[in-house]
Design a protein with these regions (language model features):
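Conserved core segment of the aminotransferase class I/II
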Residues: 224-276
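Active-site phosphate-binding strand-loop segment of PLP-dependent enzymes
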Residues: 142, 148-216
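Helix C-cap/helix->beta junction micro-motif
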Residues: 27-31, 137, 197-198
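N-terminal small-domain helix-loop-helix segment of the aminotransferase-like
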Residues: 2-101, 108
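Short acidic capping loops at alpha-helix termini that bridge into adjacent secondary structure
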Residues: 90-96, 116-119, 166, 226-227
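A short helix-loop-beta submotif of the ANL/AMP-binding
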Residues: 136-142
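Conserved PLP-anchoring active-site segment centered on the Schiff-base-forming lysine
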Residues: 112-134
Length: 276
């Protein structure tokens, strides 16, 4: 049987980190030389005992059925409380969507915000998967060279100069992978104001925010505006990379739209893990 791959699928580039991990695992399976694997960004220890015991208990008690497409209400409330206690930010649980890792959150955001031919401004260098999520939605990532002097982040001037007729928003990470740098709150506020002036969206990947130990950079973008979309994950904060648990915080008017997408795309998420 022959078939024609979609142009969208052919536009997607391999994730070379995972390709390297696959080949390294094959070498080990085939009795290759000992190696220290530095290819994947994850802790070398597993989730805390408390987490593992909670998952085992949920399985024993048969709590393995479908849940709400946005995640367990109790979990969303706990995440809301976490924002209040850690960052002093009020984030209603109704704005929190639990996802199959941060990657699923980014995919949902791109599908909710982008149409074929749209463009998204991103700093270069940036996390390579992010531009693939944009491409999978039929849009195009416009990479803007960012200098060390600018902490490898975009600023309002970048946005104003590069904004075009098909530009829909800005996607950045703070702290950034691979550079490790963050954008200062005042600079992000100016950038977001520039984006709002163009009626666009500001999407901030914050999965490494727990590794920011400087008060000037360790604050969530959600402190600045309820219109900012934030992506986060249990992977780095709680050593749960393989569990595929993440979440996104969206503006109130966007919550129902994302929920409808999640109902179709992620109803088979392993929901018992959300009972932790």
């Amino acid at each position: 049987m022959s078939f024609r791959p979609s142009q969208r699928a052919q536009r997607i580039e391999p994730f070379y980190v995972m390709e390297m991990a696959k080949h390294a695992a094959a070498m080990q399976t085939q009795g290759g030389p000992p190696m220290i694997r530095l290819n994947i960004g994850e802790p070398d220890f597993t989730a805390p005992l408390l987490v593992r015991e909670a998952a085992e208990r949920a399985i024993r008690e048969g709590r393995t059925q479908y849940t709400h497409a946005c995640g367990l209400p109790e979990l969303r409330e706990r995440i809301s409380g976490w924002y209040a206690s850690r960052f002093g930010v009020s984030v209603p649980a109704s704005r929190i969507i639990v996802t199959a890792g941060a990657s699923a959150a980014l995919q949902l955001a791109c599908l909710a915000l982008l149409d074929e031919g749209d463009e998204v401004l991103m700093p270069d260098p940036c996390y390579p998967c992010n531009r693939q999520f944009v491409a999978a939605a039929g849009a195009r990532a416009v990479l803007l060279p960012a200098s060390a002097q600018a902490r490898f982040q975009l600023d309002a001037q970048h946005v104003q100069a590069a904004w075009g007729a098909r530009t829909r928003g800005v996607l950045l990470a703070s702290p950034s992978n691979p550079t490790g740098t963050s954008i200062a709150a005042d600079e992000l506020a100016r950038l977001h104001a520039a984006v709002q002036g163009r009626e666009g969206f500001t999407l901030v990947d914050e999965i490494y925010l727990g590794l920011s130990f400087d008060a000037a950079y360790g604050q969530s973008a959600l402190r600045l505006s309820p219109d900012i979309i934030s992506i986060n994950s249990f992977s780095k904060y709680f050593c749960m990379t393989g569990w595929r648990l993440g979440w996104m915080v969206v503006p109130p008017r966007m919550a129902q739209l994302v929920e409808q997408l999640a109902q179709h795309l992620y109803i088979l998420l392993i929901k018992y893990l959300l009972q932790l």
